Amino acid sequence: MSFDGLIVENENTKSGYNDGNDLTDLFKQNGTDMSVINSLLGDTNNPGMNESPKILDSSFENSNPQDGPNYEDFDFMGSIHKEFGNNINEMDDMEDVSDDNLPEEEQAVNYTGDKDDEDFGKLLAKEMGEEAAGQVLSGVGFSIPSGLVPPSEPSKTVSSTTEELQNEAQIRESIVKTFFPTFERGVLLNFSELFKPKPVKLAPPKKKTPKVCVPGRLTLEVDTDYAIIFNSKKSLPLKRNVVSPISTHTKKRRRTANTSQRNDGLDLNTVFTTNDWEKNIIYDESDVNKTNQSSFFIDKSLVDIDFAFDENIFDGDTGTSKVVLNLNDPKLLLQPQLPKKEDSQRSFADTHQRNSLAWKFNISNDPAYEMLKQNHQSKVRNTLSQLAIEHAAFAEKLTFPYYKTRLSKRAVRSYHRPTMSFKPNAAIVFSPLIVRKRSKDKHKSERELIPTTKEITMGDTTHAILVEFSEEHPAVLSNAGMASRIVNYYRKKNEQDESRPKLEVGESHVLDVQDRSPFWNFGSVEPGEITPTLYNKMIRAPLFKHEVPPTDFILIRNSSSYGSKYYLKNINHMFVSGQTFPVTDVPGPHSRKVTTASKNRLKMLVFRLIRRSPNGGLFIRQLSKHFSDQNEMQIRQRLKEFMEYKKKGDGPGYWKLKSNEVVPDEAGTRSMVSPETVCLLESMQVGVRQLEDAGYGKTMDEINDDEDEEQPAEQLLAPWITTRNFINATQGKAMLTLFGEGDPTGIGEGYSFIRTSMKGGFKPAGETADDKPEPQTKNAHAYNVAKQQRAYEEEINRIWNAQKRGLSINNLEELAKKYGINSIHDDYVESNEETTREETPSSDKVLRIVRLYRDKNGNLERKQETIHDPIVIHAYLKKRREIDEQSTALDAVVPTGDEAIDRRNRRRLEQELAKSQKNWERRRARHAAKEGINLNGEGRKPTTRKCSNCGQVGHMKTNKICPLFGRPEGGLATMLDKN
């Protein structure tokens, strides 16, 4: 190929040299011989050079097409020609061109010779083969160790630079092919094939010689000595069923066995050895039939029957040791003996009847009473156990302000019903709910779920259960952080019922058929019925689930020092609570429980302050802010019981524990006052405030049975009275009226906890005291005890079923139809029975009172006063009504047309009539006793009393009618002397 052809082939390089003559001139100016250029380019005139690589082409190929030719390469080629002349093939190596004038390299420190090269050569020869490795190592300048590549004949031609450049591409390609056999240009490598795991050969398991099993110890079981068995008191077990029935199938099986084995009592070896074999030898044809007729076994005539029977016994064959009787034989008279049926419920007394002496003196009949106790314990099995209730940590510590020592008037009047007021035209921005993951709350206790007061907010994504009380004023309510359980009670249909149904909310609790109701005797759980119940340590109440309307939601306001935040939240579950049944009674205002709880609350605060104090002392001012209802003098009086006052110098003194007092730990401090005690005390404060607002400034803790009828309903419905009445009624110590004024619903769907007399005082609904009483028998009650108890239980069931039907209604139209549309939208109900327009002030109704005053000049002036508090309005109206009733005579009472007023007048007349009737009966009985008249129509019975002083019959000597009363000499002789 000529030089011009090179330029033509490289036109695409755009180097700027389009004419080959320009390059020729350039080479000539530099003094370069053109023969060298032609030899490098592979001129056609030099055929030997056509086989060499085109250095210039490779130079252009390795360079960027945008760049021009590399002039340094041209200068280098020119210097080669000057040094070697035209015979360029005589060059031995390119290294001679560049390294002649360089100094020799010094040997490296710690040089180990050609060991590294030899190792690398061996590795390469292992991968590529010895011949290919030799070419590679010689091409890159490594020395080939001896023995690695076989010796070859010396090359006829000296390797030149062109040959090295020609082999470089082949060497690279061979190396790539060696390590990457599947390599192709422009194709992605299969890395799964390239980097496949190294194949591993399966190593067979090594054969292990089993160890010799040598027993560590030898145990021999020695049979019991027959002498010991014979001398033992325990007799051998008798062998029963000597006569056993045999079936037809057994007969056939035994007949077949006897046919196949005639000498089953003898061993087979014995039969073979004792058999006469000579008889079976066939000497001629005539003996064939004889042999077939003879038996293979021993002839029966040679065996003694008795001996065979004995052998069977010796060999242990018990098949023929029993007497086999045919039960179908009509001549046999057999009576089958049936197994005796054991009594599963064997009484305790039957076990003692064997000992006649002990049973003879069993006068107290204790076993029968033991049976009664056992039945009673199993009957109330599931109601005696208390479920565990665990409150939050801050609730057990009674953290302020959630647990106060004394509630304010505003907090008492709005007990657990804080008012939510908004400023007019104020913008409300709702914040997103705080995300709380339920997965993090799993397997955590109540203390871990709510460690601080921040976790009790409703403004998070946790599920909310809304429970609405059907009572206007429940007896007891829980505070923040206190836990309650929702228990689903299920009663079994029968003893075999093993089902355990589960609801979406609550835990299941199964009651047996005879178990007592969880609501004591004021509610029942029918067989196969599930009753959800609100359960805690203070109350129990039935729950009735309702569907949540899609338009209802919860508005939450969270107030803090930084402002108020508002949240909107869906209602996940909604329940309506029935009437609450108290578990513990509310203490009275001046009871010992209140005093003890107040002292323990003071001790709790003192112990915690002492732990934080460096010197173990405290000041009165530290306690005053927590007990706002007490002054410093009252606090000092209580501190003197367990603390002493110390003063040093002129400085202020401090209080310190006495030497015999010990500060308990935190657990002991928390146990002094429980959160339930605080709730009971708050309920007592609410009851006191309600009585004071109603005009009863003086509360009564204890009310006797004779005084119940004389007290107004407001005092009888105080929480410390109703709770005590209910607990006594559950224990059978009292009876309740069940209906009437104490009904919290006013429509007969709740129980009245007002106590009534157990001696005929209870009257069912619809029956009054004016009804004709039953005739009284001699030496009997004036009422029928069984009939009264039966009527009492029927009334309880009627009210329970009515409450269940009423609170289970989900349809608003049905609810309005049953109770009346007006009663649903009433804003305020004054009492449990009566609702009047003037006595039902709602939040938007006020009371205006006009008063007359005299000014300083004596003139009358009118002043108008407006009252907004509904409690005060109710007290004013009630007082006004009492004044009007007192000013109105009984003879002037006439129907007014107002149902509420007429009902009050009717009740007033009935009370006056009952009072007059009672006074008349008392006067009549007093007059009859004085005159000696029997009110039943019979005369006065004669008495057998005889006076020991005067001797007359009919009185005693201490009676004033005795003629010798008060005379010490007395006696019958004195009286006769006077006569």
From Swiss-Prot:
GO cellular component, one term: transcription factor TFIID complex
Compartments it resides in: Nucleus
Record-annotated membrane-spanning stretches: none
Assigned keywords, A-Z: Nucleus, Phosphoprotein, Transcription, Transcription regulation
Signal peptide per UniProt: none
Modified residues (Phosphoserine): S244
Entry's Gene Ontology BP terms: RNA polymerase II preinitiation complex assembly; transcription initiation at RNA polymerase II promoter
InterPro entries per the UniProt record, alphabetical: TAF1, TAF1_HAT_dom, Znf-CCHC_6
GO molecular function, one term: RNA polymerase II general transcription initiation factor activity
Subunit comment: TFIID is composed of TATA binding protein (TBP) and a number of TBP-associated factors (TAFs).
Primary role: TAFs are components of the transcription factor IID (TFIID) complex that are essential for mediating regulation of RNA polymerase transcription.
PANTHER family attached to this UniProt entry: TRANSCRIPTION INITIATION FACTOR TFIID, TRANSCRIPTION INITIATION FACTOR TFIID SUBUNIT 1
Protein name (database record): Putative transcription initiation factor TFIID 111 kDa subunit
Native source organism of the sequence: Schizosaccharomyces pombe (strain 972 / ATCC 24843)
